[in-house]
Amino acid sequence: MRNITVAIDVMGGDHGPHVTVPAAIRCLARHPDLNVILVGPQDIIAAELRAHRSGPGPRLIVRHASQVVAMDEAPALALRGKKDSSMRVAIDLVKSGEADACVSAGNTGALMATARFVLKTLPGIDRPAIAAVMPTVSGHALVLDMGANVDCTAEHLLQFGIMGAMLVSAVEHKQNPSVGLLNVGEEDIKGNEMVKRAAELLRDSHLNFYGNVEGNDIFKGTTDVVVCDGFVGNVTLKASEGLAKMISTVLKAEFKRNWLTRIAGLIALPVLKAFKRRLDPRRYNGATLLGLKGVVVKSHGSADRYAFEHAIETAGDEVRNNVLKRITDQIQLLQRVAA
């Protein structure tokens, strides 16, 4: 198996090199087929490497970039005015073929705009989508779009379904993964005209289309893939994150209420730790910008080292399993059938 090279936007995210550099070092130690290009100000990267008793080598290359995209910077300004940013240079490395994938915890809008401008979309794909994994009672489900496209057509949702199914099939080695369309009800008569039309297209496609699913079906694990527009997807994501935090806060408060509940908390501690591990959002960090001519993975901006490692591993898995080719092949098949 050939080696995989991942370009890392060192300066992206809330914690920048204090997270991205040590996470890269740990991933290199765990994955012998992985090479890393750290992109950012050379002096900052060198200092962080020294702090972790590491340095450049055959599998760890430093590429200087003089600019940084701020987390609140307008995507258009980042695209036009920051051509030597760590984010832009990392994406350029994918475009040139020096890297197989790019990982960034930076500004989502700037990352999507820059990646789309530099890499372009795959043939037959109108718009890239953000695909992220969400926990379920039986494992996890892939949900897309998570916010890249607020307004979608039925054809866009069909393309999202194809891309999501191919990603799950390739990375998780699931034959014929099931695809659900997020709606306000399971019945065919439910939803707006765009969603109804999307259901028809998905049903007529070669995909294993389950039908309409509701929000609670995501967490029940009813389907392997859940398709929706970016507005609905982002609201779903933020609501689920808020719910998880609320449950954690309420549980802590209840167990600290009096001495009896504190004792109960100590008894339940092993179960609570297992519960926390299973729902730990760090385990699911790394949303893929699907539909581009290159693998680009977006880490959560507040990710710690453990979470950022998962984002790097997500990028590596997609390259190893040739996700881009699978998506391209399926889109071409759809176009031949339509013709």
From Swiss-Prot:
Subcellular location: Cytoplasm
GO cellular component term, pick one: cytoplasm
EC number of the protein: 2.3.1.274
Signal peptide: none
Gene Ontology MF terms: phosphate:acyl-[acyl carrier protein] acyltransferase activity
Cited SUPFAM superfamilies: Isocitrate/Isopropylmalate dehydrogenase-like
Pathway assigned in UniProt: Lipid metabolism; phospholipid metabolism
Main location, first listed in the record: cytoplasm
Keyword Lipid biosynthesis: yes
InterPro entries for the chain: FA_synthesis, Phospholipid_synth_PlsX-like
Known catalytic reactions: a fatty acyl-[ACP] + phosphate = an acyl phosphate + holo-[ACP]
Keyword terms, alphabetized: Cytoplasm, Lipid biosynthesis, Lipid metabolism, Phospholipid biosynthesis, Phospholipid metabolism, Transferase
Family: Belongs to the PlsX family.
SUBUNIT field: Homodimer. Probably interacts with PlsY.
Job of this protein: Catalyzes the reversible formation of acyl-phosphate (acyl-PO(4)) from acyl-[acyl-carrier-protein] (acyl-ACP). This enzyme utilizes acyl-ACP as fatty acyl donor, but not acyl-CoA.
Descriptive protein name: Phosphate acyltransferase
Organism this protein belongs to: Thiobacillus denitrificans (strain ATCC 25259 / T1)
Organism classification: Bacteria, Pseudomonadati, Pseudomonadota, Betaproteobacteria, Nitrosomonadales
